[in-house]
Amino acid sequence: PSLCGSDEATPAIIPAFGIKHGGSAFVSLIQKGDAVATVHADKATNISEYNRVYPSFNITPVKYEDETLYISNTASVDELSLCYRFLTGQNATYAGLASACREQLIRNSVLSTKTVQVGDYLPFCLTLTGAVRRSFGPFSRLSALTTFEQAQDMLVRMKNKGINNVFVRYTGIFSGGTDSEDITHSSLLRRLGGSDKLDELYQYISSQKMSLFLDIDILSSSTGFSGGGSVNIKKDGSTVTPDNVLAEATGKTSAERTLAKVGKLAKTVSSVLTDTRYNSFTGFCFNDAGKLLYSDFSDGGLLRADAANAISSAISPLSTGNSSMTVNGNFYMLKNIDVIVDMPLTPSVAGSGAYVSVPFVPLVLHGIVDYAGEPINTETNLEETLLRSVEYGACPHFEWNYEPLKKDGKDKFYYDNTINEAAEFYSKATEAL
């Protein structure tokens, strides 16, 4: 759903809302229709003396553009359902609201009943970049930033500095690098070492009781799809332009990606399973599936609510018997997920003196999955980030390359520039948690 107040709508992770007043509170969970919901929140004014929070639903997709009104001939959802939980006394707290929401999500089989395995060491999430396309004037080429051998060398150094229980998310290792191509026609990049070196890396990771997650995009491609992609309500091809955190260093801005037909995901999943059956790794990291949700208006396409169910069902074979990771954390797929990275730990709207933010999502997920915020080495205030991570029960998360992208010594993604800070951060977080 989206969250809307006086400002424009921003994405919300959990389809829930509520109000606390004195010793009473309620929380409402949107059980059906959340994919097309917007939550409105308005504080009391001289016109309305009540604080208000309520949902609205975009039942029929509509778009107005170029003096033309486009209306779908199909409703987005067949049914709407909300569950209200009322709390009083000592349960009428933000923690109580989160607990009630978690209980209902587990009851609805949205969240798993499993709990996080408590080990001797705090998990440390590490995002590695395999290969990236770099611009050189009018030309561009794929450059290796972290080969499989280099990744092992980096992990050995981390181990020697006291960093244990590492969850490695390896991005940019298939065709196209970080500008990944259609996953059904992709293969491991030989310039990173190929299957043999990947297997050697996994053997080391497994022997050290770490985890290796291969990052994949199943909903988008930088090169399009052989059978065509999804289309929007205007019947134009659907695209998305993700942020490129390495843009400043690579000289390559973000590029449009074609969105896949969600109804064809079963074929995509089958291809991924076939192509990776001889590789050794812990599981997959679902990148775009953790962030994207869209309607497909092509023939036989699926609208948002049905698309959410289709994506959740599609990733099940990829996670069966294996641990899985995702990015950002779309809630409709969390039942199959063990680790979340890049989970928002700060408010999506600008702060003001009128309210304070509370860690509602971490309160709901704590103990069910391991989670981490955005990479700490991209933050400006390390001490503040440490305190927030400890308060929210989040794992440390760093994003590194083995090869520097810049030669000025200020490359925040070059691991040698921040590995000592990471070790110190990890030590403090381990003591606190």
Predicted segments, located by residue:
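Generic alpha-helical secondary structure signal
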Residues: 92-95, 99, 149, 196-199, ...
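Aromatic-lined carbohydrate-binding/catalytic grooves of carbohydrate-active enzymes
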Residues: 119-264, 283, 291
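Hydrophobic alpha-helical scaffolding
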Residues: 91, 141-144, 191, 301-305, ...
